[in-house]
Every structure is written in structure tokens, then in C-alpha cells.
Curated annotation (Swiss-Prot):
Function, as annotated: Nucleotide-binding protein.
Organism of this sequence: Shewanella amazonensis (strain ATCC BAA-1098 / SB2B)
Name of the protein: Nucleotide-binding protein Sama_2557
Superkingdom to which the source organism belongs: Bacteria
GO CC annotations, alphabetized: cytosol
Keywords: Nucleotide-binding
């Protein structure tokens, strides 16, 4: 019986490359000349620091552009609304979601069941296993997951025939 797993993962290497490219682009930008800033990456969290909150927002936009160039889906990005002001600098955290959260998994399973395609879906930790009799049914579910607006990017792996 064919099956596959729906997962939501961000490639840490590509993310690190995007952070490095962001740092390089900011070194060359005229509006960041003479400005004290930093871009740090640790444990799937990017910390952006700058002298003004406007520059922090610009840094988020630059990071988004670099993620797009590296084929990392920006839906996995979770930007803190609050910019923290500490003395001389402003800081903003950007977290990246790994795995499918429980409530998103339940919504996706409900979406799969409402589609009336003859497949079974079950939650397995931070992924969803989808099993069906026909490969075409599984491909229809893949398309459904890609087009769903659940605020998280989905990848498919472990395809068994």
C-alpha cells in the first residue's frame, strides 16, 4: 500500500547561507554604512540587531529576499512583532518553525478527510503519515497540502510504493 509522510522542515544549511548572504548584502548597502548592526544565527533563531527599529525591519526584508534566493519558504519564518530596545540597540528575533504543530496537523487531517479522497492520515509526532490504495490519490493529497493556507510550508518524504 503506497504511503508518504508530510513534514515541515527548514534546511539549516540553506538558512545559514541565507544569513551569511544577508550579512554580506548589508556590508555593501549605503544606508547601513557607519551603522552598528549584527545578524546572529543560533538554534534556528536569527537575531537581528541595529541602531533603529526601522533598520531592524529593513534587515527582516533583506533576510526574506535572501531566503527566497536560497529556496527556503518564508512561511516557516515567525517574526516577533515586538522589537526589543536595549540601551543603544534594537533587536528582533526571527524564529523558524520545525515540524508540524499539533493544531496545524489536525486542520490538515480534517482538510484531507473533507476532500473525500480514499486515504488514511495519522499524526506521527511532528509529521503526518498518509496511506492510500492508489498513487493518484496520494498525489491529489500532495497537491491539496501544497495549496492549503495553513501558514506553514509542507514537504513530502518517505514515499513508499
Amino acid at each position: 500500500m503506497p504511503s508518504f509522510d508530510i513534514v515541515s522542515e527548514v534546511d539549516a544549511v540553506e538558512l545559514k547561507n541565507a544569513v551569511e548572504n544577508t550579512r554580506r548584502e548589508m556590508d555593501g548597502r549605503f544606508d547601513f554604512r557607519g551603522v552598528e548592526y549584527s545578524v546572529d544565527f543560533k538554534d534556528m533563531v536569527v537575531i537581528l540587531r541595529s541602531e533603529s527599529d526601522f533598520q531592524c525591519r529593513q534587515m527582516v526584508d533583506i533576510l526574506r529576499g535572501q531566503l527566497a534566493k536560497r529556496n527556503v519558504d518564508a512561511k516557516a519564518m515567525e517574526v516577533d512583532d515586538k522589537i526589543v530596545h536595549t540601551g543603544k540597540t534594537f533587536a528582533q528575533n526571527v524564529k523558524f518553525k520545525q515540524g508540524i504543530e499539533q493544531d496545524v496537523a489536525k486542520k490538515l487531517i480534517k482538510l484531507i478527510k473533507d476532500s473525500k479522497v480514499k486515504v488514511q492520515a495519522q499524526i506521527q509526532g511532528d509529521s503526518i503519515r498518509v496511506t492510500g490504495k492508489k498513487r493518484d490519490d496520494l498525489q491529489a493529497i500532495m497537491q491539496l497540502a501544497r495549496t492549503s493556507e495553513l501558514g506553514q510550508p509542507f514537504q513530502f518524504n518517505n514515499f513508499r510504493d
